[in-house]
Amino acid sequence: MSAEVSHATAYADVADALADYFDGLYFSDTARLRRIFHPQAIYACATEGKLLHLTMQEYFPIVDKRPSPASRAEPRADRIVSIEFAGPVTAFVRLHCAIGPKLFTDLLTLIHVEGRWQIISKVFHFDLKSS
């Protein structure tokens, strides 16, 4: 197998894995999110001027409690901007999505462990939609 074919396959595999991420957020479905997030992943943001740093054990209950964008019939704004590889088992993804009034830019680092791509870190910024 050539490196070009391998890279194309890895790109497609990461993009496919992100379907669980996008669907998990849109439907507030932590079962889907647990498939894409490594159990030891971190979640971080400083958009509001201070560090927000959560473990998955802290993050998933927040998702479970919030009304899903799907339940409010919000239009989906999921878009992969880029996927880059640092090596065969490490990928960096920049993507956009929206939940409620927030437009997110997510920077995800994924690792390929246990036979699948998993998010090991999510660092993000958000802007509020214009009224």
Mark where each language-model region is.
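Short, low-complexity N-terminal intrinsically disordered segments enriched in polar/charged residues
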Residues: M1-A31, R35-P39, Q57-E58
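Surface-exposed, charged secondary-structure patches
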Residues: S6, D13, I42-L103
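Short linear sequence elements within intrinsically disordered, low-complexity coil regions
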Residues: D16, Y26-F27, A31-R32, I42, ...
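Compositionally biased, low-structure terminal segments
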Residues: D23, F60-P61, H125-D127
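Short beta-strand segments enriched in hydrophobic/aromatic residues
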Residues: F37, C97, V123-F124
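Beta-strand-connecting loop/turn residues
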Residues: P39, P88-V89, G115-R116
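Short beta-strand edge/turn micro-motifs at domain boundaries
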Residues: F92, L103-S131
